[in-house]
């Protein structure tokens, strides 16, 4: 009953108005899985390739008809007749057929959409929710947890048209007892932040991930206005709410220095920027920093891990790009202590699960993440619960492409009850 009978690819639109790939996988018995590939703005150079058409007369070159053609042609042909429940085999067939190191023939966007759609179809055929099927694929059947959200309430860097260098300033509602309560706390702080910004004559326009994108006097000012909003919402910083940042430092790494426009174009060495971040962690309860240096600055990361790694979570995103080969090298060299998981960086569900397992086996944490270009597809919510990853990044409290994931988590928590504990701050490395 789980044999694939039809695969359909189509070009749809993501949250930035750019095209992306959606795939439908149909099984015997009428079961269907539907999934869409997300798309990043600040991308690691070693990510699997997102195939775009490059035809400037259509969608400014960002069309995905080549990737969709791969889904409807060679991929559909190769997986039709195969068992969708055998995820590893489905993914291997596509990866082998593509035959490139970075999925550049068909595009990671094509392969991932089919990979996720196959998983959803298989879950339907088994008569179980996707998170339950993922737990079985992960070799951890029946083991679930609700993730602690990192809510990106101030957007900067590549995610916003403002003067803030650091890409994401996030709150973690660690005082919550449930995911649903964490969402409520996040919402209350988000709305209070709007009031704080308005009172200072600042913009409340939002960036790609639904957080506010004001122009600020410095990067530290972003933390200061968040602290004000937390207090205004009736919560205590450090007790009810902790902070996290994604520096996306590769985006302001120029000629071996970290050049911060928001700090008067000051240039920092790796060591100096590490101490700049360390100073911020002394002023505010920052418990997690992502991509605190450039993806190629491994010596700098070794230093940063030595200075900060036993105190806070250091997450590798552009650094590791959800790739087990690169992650293994990082683990062997003691670089960072956590990995960001974005399944379009690697391009299949099987490889994503392998990266999560490798991280956990090494004592690293795994943070499940959206991309800045998203759709209504909420698969990452099921991925976070089904792997008991413990943490999720899926944006702020606005934009339905972000909120779709929180709403799916609320539904899952309701369905699982105490089978899926919400562990809060205990999920964060070093806390």
Curated annotation (Swiss-Prot):
Mg(2+) binds at residues 246, 290, 317. Its EC number is 4.2.1.11. Pathway: Carbohydrate degradation; glycolysis; pyruvate from D-glyceraldehyde 3-phosphate: step 4/5. The keyword Ubl conjugation does not apply. (2R)-2-phosphoglycerate binds at residues 167, 342, 371-372, 393. One of its GO terms (cellular component) is cell surface. Binds a second Mg(2+) ion via substrate during catalysis. It is found in: Cytoplasm; Secreted; Cell surface. It is an enzyme of class 4 (lyase). Its cofactor is Mg(2+). One of its GO terms (biological process) is glycolytic process. PROSITE patterns: ENOLASE (PS00164). GO terms for molecular function: magnesium ion binding; phosphopyruvate hydratase activity. Component of the RNA degradosome, a multiprotein complex involved in RNA processing and mRNA degradation. Belongs to the enolase family. This is Enolase. It comes from Erwinia tasmaniensis (strain DSM 17950 / CFBP 7177 / CIP 109463 / NCPPB 4357 / Et1/99).
């Amino acid at each position: 009953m789980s044999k694939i009978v039809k695969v359909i690819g189509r070009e749809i639109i993501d949250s930035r108005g750019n095209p992306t790939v959606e795939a439908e996988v149909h099984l015997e018995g009428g079961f269907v899985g539907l999934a869409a590939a997300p798309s990043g703005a600040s991308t690691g150079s070693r990510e699997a390739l997102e195939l775009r058409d490059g035809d400037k007369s259509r969608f400014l070159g960002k069309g995905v008809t080549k990737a969709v053609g791969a889904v409807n042609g060679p991929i559909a042909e190769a997986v039709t007749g195969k068992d969708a429940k055998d995820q590893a085999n489905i993914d291997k067939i596509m990866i082998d057929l593509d035959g490139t190191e970075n999925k550049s023939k068909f595009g990671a966007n094509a392969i991932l959409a089919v990979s996720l759609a196959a998983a959803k179809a298989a879950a339907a055929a088994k008569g179980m929710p996707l998170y339950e099927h993922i737990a079985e694929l992960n070799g951890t059947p029946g083991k679930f947890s609700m993730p602690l959200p990192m809510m990106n309430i101030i957007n900067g860097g590549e995610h916003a048209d403002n003067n803030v260098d650091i890409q994401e300033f996030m709150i973690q509602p660690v005082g919550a007892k449930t995911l649903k309560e964490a969402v409520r706390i996040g919402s209350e702080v988000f709305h209070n932040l709007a009031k704080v910004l308005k009172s200072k004559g600042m913009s409340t326009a939002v960036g790609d991930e639904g957080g506010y994108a004001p122009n600020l006097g410095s990067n530290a000012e972003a933390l200061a206005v968040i602290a004000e909003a937390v207090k205004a919402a009736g919560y205590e910083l450090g007790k009810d709410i902790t902070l996290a940042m994604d520096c996306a430092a590769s985006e302001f790494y120029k000629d071996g220095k970290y050049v911060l426009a928001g700090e008067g174009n000051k240039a920092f060495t790796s060591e100096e920027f590490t101490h700049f971040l360390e100073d911020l962690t002394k002023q505010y309860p920052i418990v997690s920093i992502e991509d605190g240096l450039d993806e190629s600055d491994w010596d700098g990361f070794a230093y940063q891990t030595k200075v900060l790694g036993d105190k806070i979570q250091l997450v590798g995103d552009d650094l590791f790009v959800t790739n087990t080969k690169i992650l293994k090298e990082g683990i062997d060299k003691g670089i960072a202590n956590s990995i960001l998981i974005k399944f379009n960086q690697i391009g299949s569900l099987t490889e994503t699960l392998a990266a999560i397992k490798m991280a956990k086996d090494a004592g690293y944490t795994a943070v499940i993440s959206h991309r800045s270009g998203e759709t209504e597809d909420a698969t990452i919510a099921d991925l976070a619960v089904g792997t008991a990853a413990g943490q999720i990044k899926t944006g702020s409290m606005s934009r339905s492409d972000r909120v779709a994931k929180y709403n799916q988590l609320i539904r899952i928590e309701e369905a699982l009850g105490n089978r899926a504990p919400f562990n809060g701050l205990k999920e964060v490395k070093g806390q």
